[in-house]
């Protein structure tokens, strides 16, 4: 018989209360706690933080102390009063002024992903995403559901921008891409990977190919100082002619779709691709036995509740890519969240 002191019960409680940890993080970001502390000339007490974020002193104190335990804040006591400031972690990832800020990603996950995950049991029963149950939006056209308002589309694109601000370099240097001077980022949204390509491979040019509403949002809300090297082109990669390129980048694209749609897209790329050209697939790869990594398994469940796809093993991607005609399959586990696959025509 287990007891409240055994390791199994403690682990169960850690899992059970995991959603509370996420909500502490989401709430502190939404309230602007980390931004307020970043802008302050020194550590702030509870009263100053509560006033700055327009919240109750009682609730603010509870939130701040929990953030300390989560190593998101640090605290010092002076004359019996607690003063709080950001840690290196929160300064790097949870303040809007940081170049590696993840604030928009957390905002998106806290409002959209978290809502869909509340219907995980329904998603498992039905085998489909939960936009209709969560937001009342039909998901027959997946990205009409994902981009269900201008605000949601911008939030999603800002989240992608932040993902690649941290993860772009590791996947774009997994292989030497200097032999591909003309690149096309299919579904490249805000152009974050395109900019990283220019930084890593001087002299290359990148076309960002995405649906018209995404391209319009990108032009309105994201800066493109490298206008001659980055071209934004409107189109649907499932049906419109694809831009000419030496390398096509599919970053977090294939995991959105079932195998049939993936095969259709890959065949379209193959027929457009020049001999010797290739595809760089960027995804979080499951181990071959599908028993891990845990984060990738969770991402695969996220694909269930939010998309039509799943995360896959290297062998699964090999099957999809080789069936479309590609050869010279290589994959590399980067040690970061996302991995890379390179194939050629």
UniProtKB/Swiss-Prot annotation:
Record's keyword annotation contains Methyltransferase? yes
Q: Can you name this protein?
A: Acetylserotonin O-methyltransferase
Pathway, per UniProt?
Aromatic compound metabolism; melatonin biosynthesis; melatonin from serotonin: step 1/2
Q: Which family does it belong to?
A: Belongs to the class I-like SAM-binding methyltransferase superfamily. Cation-independent O-methyltransferase family.
Partners and quaternary state? Homodimer.
State which tissues express it: Highly expressed in pineal gland. In the retina, 10- to 100-fold lower expression compared to pineal gland, if any.
Q: What does this protein do?
A: Catalyzes the transfer of a methyl group onto N-acetylserotonin, producing melatonin (N-acetyl-5-methoxytryptamine).
Q: Which residues form the active site?
A: 255 (proton donor/acceptor)
Q: Which reaction does it catalyse?
A: N-acetylserotonin + S-adenosyl-L-methionine = melatonin + S-adenosyl-L-homocysteine + H(+)
Positions annotated to bind S-adenosyl-L-methionine? 147, 164, 210, 235-237, 252
Quote the record's binding site residues for substrate.
256, 302, 306
**From which lineage does this chain's organism come?**
Eukaryota, Metazoa, Chordata, Craniata, Vertebrata
Q: Name one Pfam family in it.
A: Methyltransf_2
Q: Name the CDD domains for this protein.
A: AdoMet_MTases
Q: What is its EC number?
A: 2.1.1.4
Induction comment: No night/day variations.
Instruction: Give the EC class as a word.
Output: transferase
InterPro entries in alphabetical order: COMT-like, O_MeTrfase_dom, Plant_O-MeTrfase_dimerisation, SAM-dependent_MTases_sf, WH-like_DNA-bd_sf, WH_DNA-bd_sf
Which keywords appear in this protein's UniProt record, sorted alphabetically?
Answer: Lipid metabolism, Melatonin biosynthesis, Methyltransferase, S-adenosyl-L-methionine, Transferase
């Amino acid at each position: 018989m287990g007891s409240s002191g055994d390791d199994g019960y403690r682990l169960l409680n850690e899992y059970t209360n995991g959603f509370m940890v996420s909500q502490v993080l989401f709430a502190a970001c939404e309230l602007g706690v980390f931004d307020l502390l970043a802008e302050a000339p020194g550590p702030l007490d509870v009263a100053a933080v509560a006033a700055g974020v327009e919240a109750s002193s009682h609730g603010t104190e509870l939130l701040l102390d929990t953030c300390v335990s989560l190593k998101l804040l640090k605290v010092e006591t002076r004359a019996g009063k607690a003063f709080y400031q950001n840690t290196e972690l929160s300064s790097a990832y949870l303040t809007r002024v940081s170049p590696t800020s993840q604030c928009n990603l957390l905002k998106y996950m806290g409002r959209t992903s978290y809502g869909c995950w509340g219907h995980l049991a329904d998603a498992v029963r039905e085998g489909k995403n939960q936009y209709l149950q969560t937001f009342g939006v039909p998901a027959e056209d997946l990205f009409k559901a994902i981009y269900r308002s201008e605000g949601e589309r911008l939030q999603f694109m800002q989240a992608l921008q932040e993902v690649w601000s941290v993860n772009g370099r590791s996947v774009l240097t997994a292989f030497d891409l200097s032999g591909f001077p003309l690149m096309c980022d299919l579904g490249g949204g805000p152009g974050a990977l395109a900019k990283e390509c220019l930084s890593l491979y001087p002299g290359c040019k990148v076309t960002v190919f995405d649906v018209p509403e995404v391209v319009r949002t990108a032009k309105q809300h994201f800066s493109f100082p490298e206008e001659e090297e980055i071209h934004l082109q409107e189109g649907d990669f499932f049906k419109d002619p694809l831009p000419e390129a030496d390398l096509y980048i599919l970053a977090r694209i294939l995991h959105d779709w079932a195998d049939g749609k993936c095969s259709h897209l890959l065949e379209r790329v193959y027929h457009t691709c020049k001999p010797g050209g290739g595809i760089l697939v960027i995804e979080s790869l499951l181990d071959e036995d599908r028993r891990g990594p845990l984060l990738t398994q969770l991402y695969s469940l996220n694909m269930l509740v939010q998309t039509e796809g799943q995360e896959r093993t290297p062998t699964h991607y090999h099957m999809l890519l080789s069936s479309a005609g590609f050869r010279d399959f290589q994959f590399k586990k980067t040690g970061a969240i996302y991995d890379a696959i390179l194939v050629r025509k």
